[in-house]
Protein backbone atom coordinates (compact mmCIF):
# COMPACT_ATOMS: atom_id res chain seq x y z
CA UNK A 1 0.00 0.00 0.00
CA UNK A 2 1.37 3.41 -0.95
CA UNK A 3 0.02 6.94 -0.91
CA UNK A 4 0.71 10.57 -1.73
CA UNK A 5 -0.50 13.28 0.66
CA UNK A 6 -0.42 17.06 0.27
CA UNK A 7 -0.35 19.15 3.45
CA UNK A 8 -0.80 22.86 4.01
CA UNK A 9 1.44 25.43 5.66
CA UNK A 10 -0.75 27.80 7.71
CA UNK A 11 2.19 30.15 8.34
CA UNK A 12 5.73 30.15 6.93
CA UNK A 13 7.56 27.24 8.56
CA UNK A 14 4.60 26.14 10.69
CA UNK A 15 3.54 22.51 10.94
CA UNK A 16 0.50 21.55 8.84
CA UNK A 17 -2.98 21.72 10.34
CA UNK A 18 -4.89 20.45 7.31
CA UNK A 19 -4.72 17.67 4.73
CA UNK A 20 -5.13 19.33 1.32
CA UNK A 21 -5.45 16.11 -0.68
CA UNK A 22 -4.67 12.41 -0.58
CA UNK A 23 -4.30 9.64 -3.16
CA UNK A 24 -3.80 5.94 -2.41
CA UNK A 25 -2.53 3.23 -4.72
CA UNK A 26 -6.11 2.16 -5.37
CA UNK A 27 -6.84 5.68 -6.65
CA UNK A 28 -4.00 5.50 -9.19
CA UNK A 29 -4.51 2.53 -11.54
CA UNK A 30 -1.45 0.81 -12.96
CA UNK A 31 -0.71 0.68 -16.67
CA UNK A 32 2.24 -1.55 -17.59
CA UNK A 33 3.43 -1.34 -13.98
CA UNK A 34 3.31 2.45 -13.84
CA UNK A 35 0.82 5.00 -12.54
CA UNK A 36 0.47 8.75 -12.76
CA UNK A 37 -1.37 11.58 -11.05
CA UNK A 38 -1.48 15.35 -11.33
CA UNK A 39 -1.50 18.18 -8.79
CA UNK A 40 -2.47 21.77 -9.43
CA UNK A 41 -4.82 24.62 -8.54
CA UNK A 42 -7.19 23.63 -11.37
CA UNK A 43 -7.76 20.28 -13.05
CA UNK A 44 -6.32 20.49 -16.58
CA UNK A 45 -8.87 20.52 -19.38
CA UNK A 46 -9.49 17.05 -20.73
CA UNK A 47 -7.70 15.28 -17.85
CA UNK A 48 -9.91 12.88 -15.88
CA UNK A 49 -7.20 10.93 -14.04
CA UNK A 50 -6.12 11.03 -10.38
CA UNK A 51 -5.87 14.66 -9.27
CA UNK A 52 -5.31 16.73 -6.12
CA UNK A 53 -6.54 20.30 -6.21
CA UNK A 54 -3.98 22.53 -4.53
CA UNK A 55 -5.26 25.26 -2.22
CA UNK A 56 -3.43 28.54 -1.78
CA UNK A 57 -1.78 27.26 1.40
CA UNK A 58 -0.74 23.87 -0.06
CA UNK A 59 2.94 23.43 0.68
CA UNK A 60 4.37 19.94 1.13
CA UNK A 61 4.01 16.45 -0.32
CA UNK A 62 4.61 13.28 1.69
CA UNK A 63 4.72 9.81 0.14
CA UNK A 64 4.30 6.63 2.16
CA UNK A 65 5.06 2.98 1.47
CA UNK A 66 3.64 0.20 3.67
CA UNK A 67 4.71 -3.42 3.13
CA UNK A 68 3.51 -6.61 4.77
CA UNK A 69 6.98 -8.03 4.08
CA UNK A 70 9.53 -5.24 3.46
CA UNK A 71 12.21 -7.75 2.45
CA UNK A 72 10.07 -8.99 -0.45
CA UNK A 73 8.37 -5.73 -1.42
CA UNK A 74 9.62 -3.01 -3.73
CA UNK A 75 9.53 0.65 -2.85
CA UNK A 76 7.76 3.03 -5.18
CA UNK A 77 9.99 5.10 -7.46
CA UNK A 78 8.56 8.60 -7.86
CA UNK A 79 9.30 10.74 -10.92
CA UNK A 80 8.26 14.40 -10.63
CA UNK A 81 7.74 16.60 -13.67
CA UNK A 82 6.69 20.25 -13.78
CA UNK A 83 4.15 20.55 -16.61
CA UNK A 84 3.10 24.16 -16.14
CA UNK A 85 4.73 26.68 -13.81
CA UNK A 86 2.45 29.58 -14.73
CA UNK A 87 4.82 30.53 -17.50
CA UNK A 88 7.71 30.99 -15.06
CA UNK A 89 10.98 29.01 -14.92
CA UNK A 90 10.74 25.97 -12.64
CA UNK A 91 13.74 27.14 -10.62
CA UNK A 92 14.20 28.33 -7.03
CA UNK A 93 14.20 32.04 -6.25
CA UNK A 94 17.64 32.70 -4.79
CA UNK A 95 17.17 36.40 -4.20
CA UNK A 96 18.21 37.85 -0.84
CA UNK A 97 14.60 38.33 0.22
CA UNK A 98 13.59 34.79 -0.72
CA UNK A 99 16.57 33.21 1.04
CA UNK A 100 15.93 35.30 4.18
CA UNK A 101 12.28 34.25 4.19
CA UNK A 102 13.31 30.60 3.79
CA UNK A 103 15.71 30.87 6.74
CA UNK A 104 12.98 32.40 8.91
CA UNK A 105 10.63 29.57 7.91
CA UNK A 106 13.31 26.98 8.72
CA UNK A 107 13.77 28.53 12.16
CA UNK A 108 10.00 28.39 12.78
CA UNK A 109 9.94 24.76 11.65
CA UNK A 110 12.79 23.85 14.00
CA UNK A 111 11.09 25.61 16.92
CA UNK A 112 7.78 23.84 16.26
CA UNK A 113 9.54 20.48 16.03
CA UNK A 114 11.57 20.97 19.20
CA UNK A 115 8.40 21.97 21.04
CA UNK A 116 7.19 18.40 20.44
CA UNK A 117 10.28 16.20 20.27
CA UNK A 118 11.83 14.67 22.20
CA UNK A 119 8.50 13.37 23.45
CA UNK A 120 7.72 12.50 27.05
CA UNK A 121 8.55 8.82 27.32
CA UNK A 122 6.51 7.89 30.37
CA UNK A 123 5.16 9.15 33.67
CA UNK A 124 5.17 7.03 36.79
CA UNK A 125 2.09 8.95 37.95
CA UNK A 126 -0.83 8.44 35.52
CA UNK A 127 -1.71 11.58 33.56
CA UNK A 128 -3.85 12.44 30.56
CA UNK A 129 -3.45 15.11 27.90
CA UNK A 130 -6.26 17.36 26.74
CA UNK A 131 -6.82 15.22 23.63
CA UNK A 132 -7.23 12.06 25.72
CA UNK A 133 -3.76 10.65 25.10
CA UNK A 134 -2.31 8.89 28.11
CA UNK A 135 1.10 9.60 29.61
CA UNK A 136 0.95 6.52 31.84
CA UNK A 137 3.59 3.90 31.19
CA UNK A 138 2.87 0.40 29.86
CA UNK A 139 -0.61 1.32 28.62
CA UNK A 140 -2.08 2.42 25.30
CA UNK A 141 -4.53 5.28 24.96
CA UNK A 142 -7.90 4.69 23.28
CA UNK A 143 -7.70 4.53 19.46
CA UNK A 144 -8.69 7.72 17.62
CA UNK A 145 -9.17 9.05 14.07
CA UNK A 146 -7.56 12.30 12.98
CA UNK A 147 -9.69 13.16 9.94
CA UNK A 148 -8.74 16.03 7.64
CA UNK A 149 -7.66 18.32 10.49
CA UNK A 150 -4.21 17.50 11.80
CA UNK A 151 -1.21 18.85 13.61
CA UNK A 152 1.79 17.51 11.79
CA UNK A 153 1.69 14.74 9.26
CA UNK A 154 -0.96 12.24 10.33
CA UNK A 155 -3.11 10.38 7.80
CA UNK A 156 -6.77 11.33 7.60
CA UNK A 157 -7.91 7.75 6.87
CA UNK A 158 -5.86 6.18 9.65
CA UNK A 159 -6.73 5.21 13.21
CA UNK A 160 -3.94 5.69 15.74
CA UNK A 161 -3.33 4.26 19.20
CA UNK A 162 -0.31 5.53 21.15
CA UNK A 163 1.37 4.71 24.42
CA UNK A 164 4.67 4.39 26.28
CA UNK A 165 6.60 1.49 27.77
CA UNK A 166 8.93 1.41 30.78
CA UNK A 167 10.35 -2.02 31.51
CA UNK A 168 12.84 -3.48 33.94
CA UNK A 169 15.24 -6.12 32.58
CA UNK A 170 13.08 -8.94 33.98
CA UNK A 171 9.71 -7.54 32.83
CA UNK A 172 7.60 -8.15 29.73
CA UNK A 173 4.65 -6.14 28.42
CA UNK A 174 1.88 -8.28 26.91
CA UNK A 175 -0.62 -6.61 24.55
CA UNK A 176 -3.86 -8.29 23.49
CA UNK A 177 -6.48 -7.11 21.01
CA UNK A 178 -8.73 -8.15 18.14
CA UNK A 179 -8.25 -6.12 14.98
CA UNK A 180 -11.15 -4.88 12.84
CA UNK A 181 -11.19 -5.61 9.12
CA UNK A 182 -8.75 -3.18 7.49
CA UNK A 183 -6.36 -2.87 4.56
CA UNK A 184 -3.28 -2.72 6.74
CA UNK A 185 -2.27 -2.44 10.39
CA UNK A 186 1.08 -2.23 12.10
CA UNK A 187 2.60 -1.76 15.54
CA UNK A 188 5.95 -0.05 16.08
CA UNK A 189 8.30 0.61 18.98
CA UNK A 190 9.65 4.17 18.92
CA UNK A 191 12.25 6.21 20.71
CA UNK A 192 11.46 9.73 21.95
CA UNK A 193 12.05 11.11 18.43
CA UNK A 194 9.29 8.91 16.92
CA UNK A 195 11.85 6.72 15.15
CA UNK A 196 12.18 2.94 15.36
CA UNK A 197 14.44 1.96 18.25
CA UNK A 198 16.68 0.00 15.85
CA UNK A 199 16.15 -1.98 12.65
CA UNK A 200 19.63 -3.21 11.69
CA UNK A 201 19.69 -6.45 13.68
CA UNK A 202 16.06 -7.27 14.40
CA UNK A 203 12.60 -5.92 13.76
CA UNK A 204 11.12 -3.04 15.73
CA UNK A 205 7.56 -3.58 14.55
CA UNK A 206 4.98 -6.10 13.47
CA UNK A 207 2.10 -5.90 11.01
CA UNK A 208 -0.88 -7.74 9.57
CA UNK A 209 1.42 -9.76 7.33
CA UNK A 210 3.92 -10.88 9.95
CA UNK A 211 1.75 -11.29 13.08
CA UNK A 212 0.61 -14.82 13.98
CA UNK A 213 -2.98 -14.70 15.32
CA UNK A 214 -4.37 -16.68 18.22
CA UNK A 215 -6.94 -19.40 17.53
CA UNK A 216 -9.80 -16.97 18.28
CA UNK A 217 -8.48 -14.40 15.78
CA UNK A 218 -7.03 -12.05 18.38
CA UNK A 219 -3.40 -10.94 18.41
CA UNK A 220 -0.92 -11.11 21.28
CA UNK A 221 2.28 -9.04 21.16
CA UNK A 222 5.02 -9.56 23.75
CA UNK A 223 7.55 -6.78 24.38
CA UNK A 224 10.67 -7.10 26.52
CA UNK A 225 14.15 -5.64 26.66
CA UNK A 226 15.38 -8.96 25.26
CA UNK A 227 13.81 -10.92 22.41
CA UNK A 228 11.56 -13.62 23.85
CA UNK A 229 10.32 -16.81 22.17
CA UNK A 230 6.77 -15.74 21.29
CA UNK A 231 6.26 -15.52 17.49
CA UNK A 232 4.97 -11.95 17.93
CA UNK A 233 7.76 -10.90 20.30
CA UNK A 234 9.51 -7.55 19.93
CA UNK A 235 12.69 -6.47 21.68
CA UNK A 236 13.31 -2.91 22.86
CA UNK A 237 17.03 -3.60 22.23
CA UNK A 238 17.51 -3.06 25.97
CA UNK A 239 15.94 0.40 25.87
CA UNK A 240 14.31 0.79 29.28
CA UNK A 241 11.78 3.36 28.08
CA UNK A 242 10.17 4.28 24.79
CA UNK A 243 6.97 4.77 22.85
CA UNK A 244 4.66 2.44 20.97
CA UNK A 245 2.14 3.07 18.22
CA UNK A 246 -0.60 1.16 16.41
CA UNK A 247 -1.92 2.28 13.01
CA UNK A 248 -4.92 0.92 11.13
CA UNK A 249 -5.75 2.00 7.57
CA UNK A 250 -9.30 1.83 6.20
CA UNK A 251 -10.57 0.14 9.35
CA UNK A 252 -14.17 -1.04 8.97
CA UNK A 253 -14.80 -0.24 12.65
CA UNK A 254 -13.04 1.64 15.41
CA UNK A 255 -10.46 -0.79 16.87
CA UNK A 256 -10.98 -1.96 20.42
CA UNK A 257 -8.81 -0.52 23.16
CA UNK A 258 -5.79 -2.87 23.44
CA UNK A 259 -5.29 -4.45 26.85
CA UNK A 260 -1.84 -4.42 28.43
CA UNK A 261 -0.33 -6.50 31.22
CA UNK A 262 3.15 -6.40 32.74
CA UNK A 263 4.49 -9.82 33.69
CA UNK A 264 7.84 -11.21 34.64
CA UNK A 265 9.81 -12.51 31.68
CA UNK A 266 9.38 -16.05 33.04
CA UNK A 267 5.58 -15.68 33.04
CA UNK A 268 5.27 -14.13 29.57
CA UNK A 269 3.54 -16.31 26.95
CA UNK A 270 5.85 -18.20 24.60
CA UNK A 271 3.29 -19.40 22.04
CA UNK A 272 0.03 -18.24 20.49
CA UNK A 273 -3.09 -19.44 22.28
Name the predicted role of every residue range:
Residues 1-273:
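A compositional/structural signature for long, glycine/proline-rich flexible linkers
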